[in-house]
Amino acid sequence: MRTRTAAGRFACGWLVLLLAACSAPPASALLLGSTLWTYQGASSVFTAAWSPGGKYLALGEADGTVQVRDAVTGKLTFSMYGHTGAVWALAWSPDGKRIASASWDGTVRVWDMATGRQLLTYRGHTGEVLAVAWSPDSRHIASAGSDGTVQVWDAATDQHILTYRGHTNTVAALAWSPDGTRLASASFDHTVQVWDASTGEHAFTYRGHTSYVWTLAWSPDGTRIASGSTDGTVQVWDAATGKRLVTYRGHTNGVQAVAWSPDGTRIASASWDTTVQVWKATSGRQVFTYRGHSSIVGALAWSPNGERIASVADDVRVWQAS
């Protein structure tokens, strides 16, 4: 499967004997929704993930390659090879030194970002691996997939720690709470389940969707979860109680990816209707619709500084988000 509005005027000026002149960038480069760069390779891209510092954008491809590109220019930095199936999900370690890749080949691989060398291969799943997430303290990785399980394992040794079996169908997405104490998992069984990350003890099940739940994201402050579904909605709900707070119905087809802005005020959602929509997290009021793609948008990622969004369809596009 698969802009920054100018904060202030660009000033040109001079400093006697030291600075002669400067020229402003095109105004269009600073407009909300302006496309900064695009990428379309020989192999389809399925996922994108920003490095914690925002310097790099990692891409997972159908041919099993993981690419790391300069986030400003789109220029290829290096590629990593090892998977024998499509790379469906990526997660950077919080310190940006490693990246985990989840693949249809049934493995999760951990790579060194300084050298591109493969460090670990986790083989605990019995089917395609569709989701991977790094714990906030960098010690653990959680992965999930078509076998219906979520597995937590040691990020340094690949030693298995626990398996969560609360779902009855494919687990398509997962996320750690910002404090690292809980995990949320989204499934084709139409539910999102929240559970204790250290014991696997179930906390509660959210049943607001009427079809496959493809995606979820925890708010930066840990109080809310947003989940997107084939039912075409994004639902925002209280992460402690499961109470629904907002239902967003702006899309005309299934929603496959959601992401919170770093300040927690907005949510971006990517849909099979070929759009990415940005809207207020508290009210559901639409702020902007990005229409740069011509096919299903299957993945998106918000840059750490909140200024840009990377979205993935038949092509990858990086565009101004504020």
Regions found by a protein language model. Give the residues of each.
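N-terminal secretory signal peptides that target proteins for export/translocation
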Residues: 1-7
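Bacterial N-terminal signal peptides
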Residues: 11-21
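WD40-repeat beta-propeller superdomains and closely related acidic/aromatic-rich repeat-like regions
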Residues: 25-322
